[in-house]
Amino acid sequence: MTMAVLKRLARAGVVLASAAVLASCQLATHPITTNGYGPSDGIRVVVADGINVENLLVVTEAEGETGYVIGSIVNNTGTDATVLLDIGESGSPSPFEVPARGNINLTESDMTVESVDAAPGATIPTTIQGPDGFNEVRATPVLDGTLPEYAEFLETATAP
């Protein structure tokens, strides 16, 4: 073989080796599209396998005012479940009995926070308790009526 042919073979070998190395990166990388997430303004919390708190947030007009809780608790299991939410620093958790393969719309439950300890745009602590000893504190967003969907909610909630 001539020197030119050997150089071409060496270059081809480098290209093939580089392609193999780059392709192997995909094997070690977890595709982000397989991660569950809540495409919303609120938070999503996996309480247990099949039990989630979805889109949890508090809407208020201002710090110190009443806050209205938005979100839902979803139970995709075959058994009823109890989930407790303590939003803010109230110290009195609200229990929710979520039926098997059912959900609870927190907006319809008329859950409120008497006096929100944070301004819109900040977060307040929420303690979430559930089956199997689940007990976590999460930062829950506080929003105001800037977005039309929340302005409508505040108008409805404060109407006489």
What would you call each of these model-derived segments?
Residues 20-24:
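C-terminal motif of bacterial Sec signal peptides marking the signal peptidase cleavage site
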Residues 26-29:
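Bacterial signal peptide processing site
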Residues 32-46, 142-160:
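Extracytoplasmic/periplasmic copper-protein system
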Residues 46-60:
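N-terminal edge beta-strand
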Residues 71-77:
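Asparagine-centered strand-capping/turn motif at beta-strand->loop junctions
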Residues 78-92:
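Short acidic, flexible loop segments centered on an aromatic residue
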Residues 88-116:
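Intrinsically disordered, low-complexity Pro/Gly/Ser/Thr-rich segments with frequent PxxP/GP/PP motifs
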Residues 105-148:
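Extracytosolic low-complexity repeat regions of secreted or lipid-anchored proteins
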